[in-house]
Amino acid sequence: MYRKMEVSLSKDLRKKYGIRSFPVIMGDVVKVISGSRKGEGGKVAEVDHASGLVVVEGITIARADGKQKGFGIQPEKLQITHLDLSRGDRFDKIKSLAARKNIVVEKPEPEPEPRKEETAEAQEAKEEAVAEEKTEVDDNDKQN
């Protein structure tokens, strides 16, 4: 069964876009506003339209065998704090809904992902620092 699962928006998003709720997808950042997990939040990991539940990263429940499993939360108990507008159709929908209330929405700047070269350089620098610390510890041990 397919069902659009709309989640209410936070107050600042309501003011920014002029809408009260919007369908939730993977990548949105949400927080729990009621229930036993109230106050917790994170990025949406899975949206299960068949059962009508949303799984959020970092919110888990222990299974009988001791492993952790994603905890399904009903969408009416969630609130979107950050929308993932990387998909163009989603941004167009927000833009058209905001236009009804005479609100102009600008396309957000995409967050740049770190390049592999930069992360490799940072990793090498970290390894060098660890190697220097080890040699200092070895030198101190030899002197004592």
From Swiss-Prot:
Q: Which biological processes are named by the entry's GO terms?
A: translation
Among SUPFAM superfamilies, the record links this protein to:
Translation proteins SH3-like domain (SSF50104)
The UniProt annotation puts the region (Disordered) at 102-144
GO molecular function list = rRNA binding; structural constituent of ribosome
Cellular component GO terms, alphabetically?
Answer: large ribosomal subunit
Cite the record's Basic and acidic residues compositional bias ranges. 103-134
Compositionally biased intervals (Acidic residues): 135-144
What SMART domains does the annotation carry? Answer: KOW
Cross-referenced InterPro entries, in alphabetical order?
KOW, Rib_uL2_dom2, Ribosomal_uL24_CS, Ribosomal_uL24_euk/arc, Ribosomal_uL24_KOW, Translation_prot_SH3-like_sf
Q: What UniProt keywords apply to this chain's record, in alphabetical order?
A: Ribonucleoprotein, Ribosomal protein, RNA-binding, rRNA-binding
The protein's assembly and partners: Part of the 50S ribosomal subunit.
Return the protein name.
Large ribosomal subunit protein uL24
Which organism's genome codes for this protein?
A: Thermoplasma acidophilum (strain ATCC 25905 / DSM 1728 / JCM 9062 / NBRC 15155 / AMRC-C165)
Gene name for this UniProt entry? rpl24
